[in-house]
Curated annotation (Swiss-Prot):
SUPFAM superfamilies linked: RNA-binding domain, RBD
GO BP term, example: endonucleolytic cleavage to generate mature 5'-end of SSU-rRNA from (SSU-rRNA, 5.8S rRNA, LSU-rRNA)
Top-level division of the source organism's lineage: Eukaryota
Cross-referenced InterPro entries: ABT1/Esf2 (IPR039119), ABT1/ESF2_RRM (IPR034353), Nucleotide-bd_a/b_plait_sf (IPR012677), RBD_domain_sf (IPR035979)
Comp. bias intervals (Acidic residues): 37-53, 75-92
Entry protein name: Pre-rRNA-processing protein ESF2
Lineage: Eukaryota, Fungi, Dikarya, Ascomycota, Saccharomycotina
Disordered, as annotated region: 1-116, 248-324
Provenance organism: Yarrowia lipolytica (strain CLIB 122 / E 150)
Presence of keyword rRNA processing: yes
Summary of the function given for this chain in its UniProt record: Involved in the small subunit (SSU) processome assembly and function, and in the 18S rRNA synthesis. Required for the early cleavages at sites A0, A1 and A2.
GO cellular component: nucleolus; small-subunit processome
Amino acid sequence: MARAKAVDFFSTKNNSSDSEEEEDKPAVDPRFVLADSDSEGEEEQEDGDEDEEEKGRTSKKKTKDFFELAGKTDDGDDEEEDEEDEEEEEEEKEKKPVKTSSTKAKTKPMTKEEIEKHNKKIAKTGVVYFSRIPPLMDPGKLRMLLQRFGIVDRIYLVPEDPKAQAVRIRHGGNRALAYTEGWAEFTKKRYAKTCASTLNGNTIGGKKGSQHYDDIMNAKYLPKFKWSDLSEQLAQETHNRQARLRTEISQATRENQTYIQSLEKSKAAERRRQRQEEEGGETEEKPAKKVHRDFYQGKTHSARAKEGKKELDGSVGSILGSVM
């Protein structure tokens, strides 16, 4: 009996401790308790999400590799450019920006290394020529269109002739400024090559509601052509235009001067005639002098005339001889 009581005592104690632990635990609503099937479904969803993420990563890698292969060219220059770009990026990371105390930073002359780097950057650039610019397209829209092929540095578009624009507006055309041709500079040659090969002879595309959806671009990559060549060409054209304007202006001034001189002479002659009329009355018009010209006939000299003269002299001499 004593043993049974002891066992009951310890069992009650354990039961009481279990009940106390259950009381300490917070009450949980059975509606929010997940069943075993729900937990298994969540685990399956997590596994599926992980698989999808891995697939997305692999697809991104594949697309990245595809675009890298599409952007690469067969030339060895592009590979060298990539290596040089990586070296330049590492050098820029190593360099730290220098803080200037003064607000106005003094411009320092470039060193030989900086000049060499600048020349290397210029040698990597590529220029694309556009023989036609779609209507209502400005440099900003063209830059947005070309940025999908690579980094665009500079863009220059030739505006329409003001006279042609006035005629177009007079006939009911759009008042917006139009452009006839243009050039775009890319930081890398491969960007320019892919841009020219993709856009040349093809529609711009994009959204069907866009105003340039069906416009066709004419693009050409200019090998061994740099932006400095374009600036020199434009400067030469402006110089020739100014020289032509100077010659036209000088010719117009000469014509005006001759017209003014002849006008002054005619006015002076008119004033002189009026003064003579006031002083001596009406001036009688003097008859114009007749010009007498004498014309003298030149003597003819020919072999036939000389032969006839000799025959005449011989016949006259024979007659005189017979008479004498």
